[in-house]
Amino acid sequence: MESEQPAAVKASAPIEEPQSTETAVELGKHSTLKADLSIDKLETATTEATNAVVEPVEMEQQVENELVNESTQAMTSTTTQEKVVGSVNNLVEEQQCVEMEFETSSDLVVQGSPSEESKKVASDASATVTAPQVQPAPHVDSSPQASGLSLLAAYSSDDSDDEKVTPVQNGDNDVIEVPVTDPASSTTAYRPVVAVSSDDESSKSSSSSSDSDSDSEGEYLTVLRKKIDKRINTVDCDEDDEDFDEDGATGDRSRRRQPPKVRGEMLLDDLPPIHQLEITVPEDECVELGKVQSIVDQLVLVSVLPNSMLFDLDTVLFLEKGRKVLGEVFDVLGQVSDPLYCVRFNSNKQILDRGIKIGDVVYCAPKTEHTQFVILSKLMQVRGSDASWEHDVEPPARYVDHSDDEEEREARAEQRKRRQRDRTNSTDSVDTVTSVATTATKASSVAPPPRQRGRRGQRESFRQSQRPSINQHNQNQPQDEQYNFHPSYNPGSWHSNYYQNYHQAAANFNMAQQHPGMPFPVPNYGYGMPYAMPPMYPHMYPPPPPFAPPPPNNQSHQGQPPPS
């Protein structure tokens, strides 16, 4: 009996836990009231059990049961007080967490409680309570807020009940669904989806059951859809959106999508139309060039045979051995060894009308004026550049950089020579340049050789010092052009008058001898053979030559009397 009664008390304790928060003063009083209630319940339960079991039993057992009941009541009172205090503390902590969540988010979910005690919430802890009565908590709106399951249910119900988007029968791409990213609706579990139609009459905007302004979003997306349609379907991408109609129509122009282009670039449709050529060439002048490889829109691509001649633009190609004209070469693609010649037409329909098919044999006439060859020298003069200039076009020639270091050096050297040439022509003459060059050559020739060391160097230096003196002595002794006479010989002296064949003796030892034994040339009189000069005498006048005729006007000296 004693072991079973506390278990019954413990089993009933958690059923009676309060669901509301109270102050510290109210906790004690309220706990006493609950303890009394629990004791009364236990007493009634135990008395009923004992009365049912112990009717034929003696009074002694009843006394013992009463003692046991008193002890169990004391134990249950203490345990219930402890449990009530613990449950109240837990409820206070839970209430604080709920208040924090209520401040952070506006959507607070309040679930209803089945018991009346859970609806009683204690007032503020700072308020003083005089009477042991429980004050109800402030009324909280318990209307169902937007939670995850409720939003999902609302989303599924909106599709069927609230609003329906009318389908558009214009086409598959007329309706688009764009998710709206609105910061006001970011707290919801999903983003509203708006259906937009490109047609003005059928353009309607709809959103899910959110409080955001769906009308403004629908109008904005409708305008955006129109702009997208205009951009896709227009031909000229550079024109503004205001230049087109409201529904994006462009008149008679084609609505096909055009490739991107830069400013100033012309597409195939922008080029002037091609006039059909009526040319025929003899069959013997035609040479097979290749075949029609493919047809792309309004271009015919011709592949050539290996090791064939290279042709330039505007070369006329033929079909059927010269009897039919294919067209002029519009562009050349591919490698130099295996080029592809492009022939342009006005439209693809024109190609079909002329009966041009893939695999047709193409001919050329290299001996006629309709063929343009590639000249390598002219091709090398064309300078291309990979650099991008304004509007993604190639830069002009004056802005092209050199692609090779050697070319850059050659160009700089040529510019340097040109500047030097211009400077020379403007300041100095050709004679001045020649004189400067001659002076530089002489200076380089007069420059002494490198000096040597040792005894050999001393001998060479002595010889070099003696050579200039000898040369200077020879230059200072001028010689007669006709005779190699002594410099002191004077042909206008009286000796020449009386002695025309007189020659002064070689008494001057300063005169250098030309030939050993022959100081003077052979005289033109007497013997024709050379002979030695007569010895010198110590008188002033030498004797006359032995076989010479007497001098004129000097007969008195010969023993004859003077004329009377």
Curated annotation (Swiss-Prot):
Keyword Nucleus carried by entry: yes
Xref: Pfam families: Gar1
Broad class of the protein's primary localization: nucleus
Signal peptide location: none
UniProt-annotated stretches for the region Disordered: 1-29, 108-218, 238-264, 387-489, 538-564
GO molecular function annotations of the record: RNA binding
Compositionally biased tracts (Acidic residues): 238-249
Bias-annotated ranges (Polar residues): 468-489, 554-564
Gene3D superfamilies: Probable tRNA pseudouridine synthase domain
Residue ranges with Basic and acidic residues bias: 388-402
Residues with the Phosphothreonine modification: T250, T427, T432
Composition bias type Low complexity, residue spans: 146-157, 426-446
Name the UniProt record assigns to this protein: H/ACA ribonucleoprotein complex non-core subunit NAF1
Organism whose genome encodes this protein: Drosophila melanogaster (Fruit fly)
